[in-house]
Amino acid sequence: AMAANSNLKRVADQGFGQSLLDSTIRIGDGKVGDIQQKFAMLHLDPARPRNSRTHGLDEMAPTLPEIFEAWKDKLNHGDRGPAILLDLSPRLDNSQRIEVEEIVETFWPNIGKTWVWTSRGKGRVDRLSLWIGQLSSPNVQRRFVRIPPDIKEKPLVIEGDIEEISEHR
């Protein structure tokens, strides 16, 4: 959260103007507390054990349902619902991603969702995130972003929908 705050400050300093500088950035453990303010976006990076082999959803603290319950009435809604960005373990398998989607659906039925895998190469996925509601891309369920070694080059972005090609696997 501290890094996100610092990154937003850097973005604001590069010309995004006073509106970003006037924004409230709340850093904490995911529990809202007694506040009356509504928020435009929730960026959640739940704590996970560093040396875990399973990267199960039950290892996140606090859990996604706890956080969504705390925040659901504190988020502004646009025409596609609230703006939520979940940073998750890149090791989540398909069944765990489906479980995350089911949890999201219990709080915001039929909301748009875009899964984003990000890699810097060397055969590994560095980040996995779920962009929800206002942050999701309509008609794009999955996106892969390959960041090149030279930051002056544009990243490779591949987008598409889910299409099962086999029941096996």
How does the language model describe each region?
Residues 2-38:
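S-adenosyl-L-methionine
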Residues 34, 38-39, 43, 48-169:
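Class I S-adenosyl-L-methionine
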